């Protein structure tokens, strides 16, 4: 009985792990804002700048004036379950999503000063279980192939340190999902459970 309970528990944990996962993205610049400082590669490298750090250092993408947009391409249709991002604390930012790179709709609005940092870079998250969760970030999961971010208001000096998405490939995506490590673990545990049950019968 104990073995069966252990197997069922592990199966449940593996099933949860197989669902939501970080979404891999490719970043590009779009818009008419002109020059920006920093490398686009810092926006999706998984590294969040230190909070309250200076807005225009090399580990961020920074610029002056509105017009710049930075696009995150998922490579397939994904359901976005949560967003975690690092931006300059005293500016407003808009994230929009699209399935076709043509029609865009609002995904998330980040208002100036909603985080806990009073100066410099602030990390914020929509996931209530994240230590950086900000309750003022109204977020609804959406299916998208692209997300873009742009500045909307503030002191005209803007900065983004990281934008990370968590979710899973949508059922109607263009390709069949490749089994992830968590999914393979789920299969292995299922087979192990069947083996234990069979051994008890013999």
Predicted regions and their residues:
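Positively charged n-region of N-terminal signal peptides that target proteins for export
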Residues: 1-4, 180, 197-202
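Sec/Tat signal peptide C-region and signal peptidase I cleavage site
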Residues: 16-20
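Predominantly extracellular/luminal regions of secreted and cell-surface proteins
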Residues: 22-52
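Extracellular carbohydrate recognition and processing domains
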Residues: 108-136
């Amino acid at each position: 009985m104990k073995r069966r309970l252990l197997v069922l528990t592990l199966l449940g944990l593996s099933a949860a792990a197989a669902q939501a996962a970080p979404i891999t993205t490719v970043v590009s610049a779009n818009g008419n804002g002109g020059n920006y400082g920093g490398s686009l590669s810092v926006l999706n490298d998984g590294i969040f700048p230190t909070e309250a750090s200076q807005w225009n250092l090399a580990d961020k993408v920074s610029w002056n004036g509105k017009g710049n947009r930075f696009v995150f391409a998922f490579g397939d249709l994904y359901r976005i379950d949560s967003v975690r991002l690092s931006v300059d604390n005293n500016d407003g930012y808009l994230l929009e999503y699209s399935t076709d790179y043509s029609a865009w709709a609002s995904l998330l609005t980040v208002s100036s000063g909603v985080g806990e940092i009073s100066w410099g870079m602030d990390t914020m998250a929509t996931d209530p279980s994240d230590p950086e969760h900000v309750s003022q970030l109204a977020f609804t999961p959406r299916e998208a192939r692209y997300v873009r971010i742009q500045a909307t208001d503030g002191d005209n000096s803007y900065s983004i340190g990281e934008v990370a998405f968590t979710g899973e490939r949508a059922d109607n995506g263009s390709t069949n999902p490749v089994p992830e490590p968590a999914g393979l673990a789920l299969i292995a545990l299922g087979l192990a459970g069947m083996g234990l049950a069979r051994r008890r019968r013999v």
